[in-house]
Amino acid sequence: MHPLTLPKQSRVLKRKQFLYITRSGFCCRGSQATFYVVPSRHPGTCRMGITVSKKFGKAHERNSFKRVVREVFRHVRHQLPNCQIVVFPKGHKQRPVFSKLLQDFINQIPEGLHRLGKTKATTGGECTPKSEKCVTAPR
């Protein structure tokens, strides 16, 4: 299979999966997007889902954001640790920049997993994402 494809098993598809990741995951904020990250149960897999509300803009703007995020994920999927990610856009009608999103993926996701591991270790396996503050990217 071509290395830059995005097969179905690399995508988060069901509402139940999205809810699990956003509720139990660690929030990381980049310059272009907000990521919720949880470790993956299956070794060798990194999965991603994208959520863009209608507040972001018209359909072509939402689709454009999703297209760029999917393309970035295709390029960095093999560099990321085993995890499940849900991506939300940051800001309204902000046009995504490929290079900034690429840096956000490479920097924020491993850091979020590292912090999630620390949080679970200190609280005995429980993670309360609502009480945790989001990790913000340096400006």
Curated annotation (Swiss-Prot):
One of its GO terms (cellular component) is ribonuclease P complex. Keywords: Endonuclease, Hydrolase, Nuclease, RNA-binding, tRNA processing. Disulfide bonds: none annotated. It is an enzyme of class 3 (hydrolase). The keyword Acetylation does not apply. Consists of a catalytic RNA component (M1 or rnpB) and a protein subunit. Belongs to the RnpA family. This is Ribonuclease P protein component. It comes from Chlamydia pneumoniae (Chlamydophila pneumoniae). The gene is rnpA.
